[in-house]
Design a protein with these regions (language model features):
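Short, Lys/Arg-rich, polar N-terminal cytosolic tail immediately upstream
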Residues: 1-23
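Internal alpha-helical transmembrane segments of multi-pass membrane proteins
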Residues: 23, 27, 56, 80-101
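Hydrophobic alpha-helical transmembrane segments
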Residues: 24-32, 65-69, 94-98, 119-123
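Membrane-water interface at the C-terminal end of transmembrane alpha helices
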Residues: 26-30, 127-142
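Transmembrane alpha-helical segments of multi-pass membrane transport proteins and ion-pumping complexes
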Residues: 34-46, 72-80, 109, 129-134
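Membrane interfacial helix motifs at helix-loop boundaries and amphipathic/re-entrant anchors
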Residues: 40-69, 106-123
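Membrane-interface elements of multi-pass transporters and channels
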Residues: 44-56, 84-89, 138-142
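Core segments of alpha-helical transmembrane spans in multipass integral membrane proteins
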Residues: 61-81, 95-105
Length: 142
């Protein structure tokens, strides 16, 4: 007697027995790329004379990278939760991501006193979102 077992859709093993984690890999790669891009934009803006300071405190370049990567990880966790417990995960993730992008831009618009810093902070948010959201949305269940 022969028994055929269909491969699991949630865990795909390779020939070496290792498990594939496409959402984890996508989250890390998108987070690193977005963090580098946001930091580069901040560095270019600072070199061009944008103060990048809030209440007299300079925003460290590492802060751009850290917070961007944290945002990517949170996005990956949201996709994982939606894939597990929700129907139409992709659509719901896109709505949640759009709302979080808007909310995350509020301090960028309200805190810095100068327009150049505000524009730079919003630009880094939008650039990071443009990199992270499509990558994670592709990993969300349709």
């Amino acid at each position: 007697m022969t028994v055929t077992v269909a491969p699991s859709a949630t865990s795909i093993g390779s020939t070496t027995g290792r498990r594939s984690h496409p959402l984890l890999k996508a989250t890390v790669v998108a987070g690193l790329v977005a963090a580098a891009a946001a930091t580069a934009v901040a560095a270019v803006a600072h070199a061009a004379g944008v103060p990048l300071a809030i209440d007299g405190e300079q925003i460290p370049f590492l802060g751009f990278a850290q917070m961007t990567f944290v945002g990517a990880v949170l996005g990956g966790l949201i996709v994982a939760a939606l894939n597990r417990w929700s129907g139409r995960a992709r659509q719901r993730f896109q709505v949640i991501a759009a709302a979080l992008i808007v909310v995350s831009c509020v301090p960028s618009v309200s805190l810095p006193p100068d327009t150049a810093t505000k524009l730079t902070l919003v630009a880094t948010h939008l650039l990071a979102a443009a990199i992270i959201v499509p990558v994670l949305a592709r990993r969300a269940a349709p």
